[in-house]
């Protein structure tokens, strides 16, 4: 048999609810506030069929460009053959959540601002760029009275 062409084909596990998370959608889902410019993750929720994104957008991250009473408009990148298109989709709020991908960046910006402020008060220069981890400091290895053992590879022998 050939594959069917349904819009929910192959989503048996994708849109299923997690173990012991079936039933009524928690109210916290509806209490979240979305504004233009927010970065959100798209994850289809099988409990609510209305306003569900197509399976190709499941797991994607996009930016909110429009907010209505029940849904939000999101700009998402979608690869079609060789090109990446910025698609605009409308999704109900049950199927999205705020992305944590930007949290580490915002935290770093806040820390850098704090460092800049302190350096300005002291009148010193501060390094803000992320630096690779330096080599470890020199240290002695304790052998507890045992002699170190020399390891060397076994020479290769051709067996025919």
From Swiss-Prot:
<dbReference type="InterPro" id="IPR036948">
    <property type="entry name" value="Ribosomal_eL21_sf"/>
</dbReference>
<comment type="similarity">
    <text>Belongs to the eukaryotic ribosomal protein eL21 family.</text>
</comment>
<keyword id="KW-0256">Endoplasmic reticulum</keyword>
<dbReference type="GO" id="GO:0003735">
    <property type="term" value="F:structural constituent of ribosome"/>
</dbReference>
<dbReference type="GO" id="GO:0005840">
    <property type="term" value="C:ribosome"/>
</dbReference>
<keyword id="KW-0689">Ribosomal protein</keyword>
<dbReference type="Pfam" id="PF01157">
    <property type="entry name" value="Ribosomal_L21e"/>
</dbReference>
<protein>
    <recommendedName>
        <fullName>Large ribosomal subunit protein eL21</fullName>
    </recommendedName>
</protein>
<dbReference type="GO" id="GO:0006412">
    <property type="term" value="P:translation"/>
</dbReference>
<dbReference type="GO" id="GO:0005737">
    <property type="term" value="C:cytoplasm"/>
</dbReference>
<dbReference type="GO" id="GO:0022626">
    <property type="term" value="C:cytosolic ribosome"/>
</dbReference>
<comment type="subunit">
    <text>Component of the large ribosomal subunit.</text>
</comment>
<comment type="function">
    <text>Component of the large ribosomal subunit. The ribosome is a large ribonucleoprotein complex responsible for the synthesis of proteins in the cell.</text>
</comment>
<dbReference type="GO" id="GO:0005783">
    <property type="term" value="C:endoplasmic reticulum"/>
</dbReference>
<dbReference type="InterPro" id="IPR001147">
    <property type="entry name" value="Ribosomal_eL21"/>
</dbReference>
<dbReference type="GO" id="GO:0045202">
    <property type="term" value="C:synapse"/>
</dbReference>
<feature type="compositionally biased region" description="Basic and acidic residues">
    <location>
        <begin position="112"/>
        <end position="123"/>
    </location>
</feature>
<keyword id="KW-0687">Ribonucleoprotein</keyword>
<dbReference type="InterPro" id="IPR008991">
    <property type="entry name" value="Translation_prot_SH3-like_sf"/>
</dbReference>
<keyword id="KW-0963">Cytoplasm</keyword>
<dbReference type="GO" id="GO:0022625">
    <property type="term" value="C:cytosolic large ribosomal subunit"/>
</dbReference>
<dbReference type="InterPro" id="IPR018259">
    <property type="entry name" value="Ribosomal_eL21_CS"/>
</dbReference>
<feature type="region of interest" description="Disordered">
    <location>
        <begin position="112"/>
        <end position="146"/>
    </location>
</feature>
<feature type="compositionally biased region" description="Basic and acidic residues">
    <location>
        <begin position="136"/>
        <end position="146"/>
    </location>
</feature>
